[in-house]
Each structure stands twice: as C-alpha cells, then as structure tokens.
Amino acid sequence: MMATSGIANRVKTWLISTWHVKVPDPWLEACINWIQEENGSSLLQAEINKQVFEQWLLTDLRDLEFPVLPANITDSLKCELNGFHAVQMDSLVDISLPAYSQLQKLKGKDSTNEQVTCTTQQSQKPWEAKPTRMLMLQLTDGTQHIQAMEYRPIQALNANLSPGTKMVLQGTIVCRLGVLLLKPENVKVLGGEVEALVAEYTQTKVLSRLIGVEDNTVAQHSNVQEHAAGVAAGELGQALGPSDEDLLASLEENEEFSINNGVPSESGYYSRNENSSISSSTQHQTQDSIVRCWVDDDILEFSINNGVPSESGYYSRNENSSISSSTQHQTQDSIVRQTSFPMLDQTVVHVNVANNHAIEEQFDIDDELFLEEEIQRELEEMSMSQAEVTHGSTDLPTTLSATSHASSASCTSDQNNIDIPPYTYLSTILASKSRSITCVKLKSFIVTLNGNLSHSCGLWNIKAKISDGTGYLNVEFSDDVLTELIGFTVPEMKTLKKDPSQQSTLMEGLQKCQRMLTDFCGVMTVSYNPAKEEAVVLSLQDVTEEIMQSLQKLLRS
C-alpha cells in the first residue's frame, strides 16, 4: 500500500519538517499516484516532494477535511495558539478604511467626497502617528473557520493575496473572542491559490457584500497570481526551505487622506482630499486651508501677495470675488451686535464650501444625501423628547438690546399669527398665506453655504441654506451676526491685511466664524419676506434653560 510505502512516508516527513504541512494519507496516496502516472515512476524523491507541495498549494483545504487547529478555538473568550498550523486564507479586507471608498477606488470611481462621513473627524496633530492598515483575514484549516486580524503591520500580507493562499501560523498567538491577533513573527506566507475561490472572493465582491451591494462585475484576478503557485518552485530545488524574500508580497502604503484641520470642531462634516500638485487646472487644499476656501480672494490676498510663509502652502481656489448688492443689506445696519453664544447644542452639520463651478466640480457633494441623514436624526430626537413642538416666539433674543426702525418695522406685520413661544417651525412659516415681512425664531442649523464669505459696501455677507427638520430656507446672515462671529468689521479687516504681523489674528477670526457656523444648532431670529422669498438672519441664540421650560409648559398646557 502507498500509505506504508517509503515514498509516501518520506514525502509526509518532508512536508512536516520543511513546511509544517500536514495532509491526510488518502489524499497523499492519490497525489503521488497521479504524479507518477503523469511523469513516470522514475522521478527522484526531491521532485515528488516538490510536486506534492505544489498540488497542496492549489488544493482547497475543505476537500481534505484534515483539522490542524485546536477544536472549538472560536468558542473561547481568550486563549493562546501555540506551535505551527498550516491554514488557508479565503479572503481578506482592510478594515482601517471605509469599505465603500475602497470599492469605488477599485471601480475607478474614486472621489474625495467618498471620504466624507457623518461622524466627527478629529484633526490629526503633527506629532500623532498616521493611521495604519489593518487587514482582517478569513482563515480555515478545512474543518474550522476563524478570523485573524493584523494586530501589528505584517509585510508578508497585502490586499493582493489570492483567495486560497496558504500560510503558516507560528509561535504564540493570542486569540480573543475567536479572532487571532497576528504579529509579523506569527505569519509565514507559502503562496498558492484556489481557482474556485479566486472568482468568489475578489476584493470587489468582498467589499460589495460588506455594504450590502450586488456585484455584477467580472471576477478580478490578483496581481500576484503569477507567483501564487510558484512561490516554492524557485527554492524547493535548491535546499531545505524557501527564501522569505521571494514569498513576501510587496507592501504598498495605503493612500492616506489628509483631514482638513482648519476647524477643530467637535461636530460637523469634513472633506478629506487626496494631495495633488498645484497646476493651472487643479487646485491644492491642505490641512489648514478649509477656512480659506470659503473666503473670497480679496480678504486673504494679503497673505498671498506678501509671501507670508504658510505651513499649508495655500493657494486660492476662486477666480473672482463674489460682490453682493448693497440692497441685500438694507436691514443689517440696525441690528445691535450679539455679545456671545457659547455652543450648548453640538449638532452634526455639513457645510459645503462651494462658490463657483470649479469648486462645485471638485466638491460634488450631494447635499440631499447628507441632509436626509441629519433630518432623520433631528426628527428622531424630537419624537423622543416630545419637546420639539412646531411653535415660535414673539420676542427677539435677550442678547439683542435694541433694533432700529428699519428692522423693527420689518418684523411687526402678521407676527402673532404664526409665532408662538419659544420658536416656530419652517413648515408653519412656509405654509402660511401671509405675504407680509415676518420676524420669527427657528431652532435650526446650517445645511450648506450657498457662497463664499464676502464683503460689499463695508459689510460682511454670506448666504446659506438652513433647516429645522421640517423644511429648508435660503438665508443671508446679517453683517452684525458675522462681525460678532469674526471679531472685526470689514474696515478693521482691511487694516489687519496691511500689517503682516496681524495675519494670525485675521485667520483666527475667520476660523472662529466658520467653526461657529459649522457647529451651531440653536435659535435663529430670521426676518422673512415671503413676497421676495428673502430671509435675513438677525441673531443667533443657544437653546437655554428658559426655552426648555417654555417647551415643557406648552406640553403641559
């Protein structure tokens, strides 16, 4: 019998001593018989050893049904795996990056907008380590399936490894909750692939399954397929073991996206852009330039024209400054500045800093997609607290001590018909048949900026779209609100531009304004003209304890 023959015993001993590979006797017998039939019985022992190993590399270990991992290892909360265990990798995925962005990159549809998330993206400090790749592997010994995580960077692993690749787990490996925590010394890649798995576990299909999307693309073959089965071919004929250098796949650094840290906000959406060289057709935005891309060129031309050194290497995106008509500010001169409004309600919002077509092409963000998630969250909060009722207030915020005749006159008509304490809702305003100018309070947030921060006739100006969960409204922020946020007026800004030592003061003011607008979710006092469909934000106010008490009284009444 072949099981007791000297050839089979020598092959089995060689596999275990050289590669730590264990195979069942029936498979080994059948493999040796097939090799001898194909090549004759005059093969040398070394040639038989080599061909048996190559056949094992191409075999699905499920067909062998030969266990090598400890029984029930996945059921233990914590254990250690010791010794040598030859296993098969069915698939792997990089869990350090969003699956959707990886999928889009594989399909050639990569976009910086795919990196925008609905969670807080903290700015990375210069001294902080860059995020590293973390692969999650699906392994099997033919009878048990187990996950393994790249606990430390492992050069032998990369995303191009073919499904069905064989590897040896060696040394002491900690296993927690059925997941092996792999370190570089724990993994030795042997190579190989399984043809049936190559089509089933392509990166495109694996990522598509993770996000619940059907993948209809043609199966992709790994870039390292040419050496999958021939890893040992160049080395087996030389000596006892293969060279690790020939078995290691080249490690490619994952492309990192720099997070705009110009706004160290605790909430809000951030766009992460791939770094690119500056040219006449492409614009370069680095970490501290998020403030600059929503400000007109003439406001920041001081720092550019005077060659002030900048860590960001910023260059302006916009070709033309946006000049606003002075008629848009007729209600602004009369508003007394609001002294402060600390951020009490930290709501995640998204600011799209698009002004012209060039920016819109680069930041082609679907506002409705983000808004749908934000509105859904707002509505859930309102339904849970039962405190967000569709009523409003007749009073301006207490932080505004007085108003002039112009703004007062614009906020008196039909006010009592729709404005009930402590604030009203956009759906109520938009549904009203009144055509008179109305001054109302809205608990709202900014959905998107409809232009850049600009100035005209000595007044600050920026337009935006706001929402409270029941509707949308295009508004313009008054000069007094923007001046309070920025910290200086337009004439004062022009003075600061002339002094190179004041550049930091100028930038800090703009950063503060953007941060406040990004984070704000509170009560806005808005003058709304339904006839012209125009609205001006007159003041901003946080949700105070007094407002909450008013809501509770309404609920009890």
Swiss-Prot record:
This is RecQ-mediated genome instability protein 1. InterPro entries: RMI1_C, RMI1_N, RMI1_N_C_sf, RMI1_N_N_sf, RMI1_OB. Belongs to the RMI1 family. One of its GO terms (molecular function) is nucleotide binding. It is found in: Nucleus. Component of the RMI complex, containing at least TOP3A, RMI1 and RMI2. Essential component of the RMI complex, a complex that plays an important role in the processing of homologous recombination intermediates to limit DNA crossover formation in cells. Promotes TOP3A binding to double Holliday junctions (DHJ) and hence stimulates TOP3A-mediated dissolution. Required for BLM phosphorylation during mitosis. Within the BLM complex, required for BLM and TOP3A stability. Keywords: DNA replication, Nucleus. It comes from Xenopus laevis (African clawed frog). Residues 259-275, 310-320, 383-397 have a biased composition (Polar residues). GO terms for biological process: DNA replication; double-strand break repair via homologous recombination; resolution of meiotic recombination intermediates. Its main location: nucleus. The gene is rmi1. Residues 259-284, 310-329, 382-413 are annotated as: Disordered. GO terms for cellular component: nuclear body; RecQ family helicase-topoisomerase III complex. The keyword Nucleus applies. It comes from the Eukaryota. Residues 398-413 have a biased composition (Low complexity).
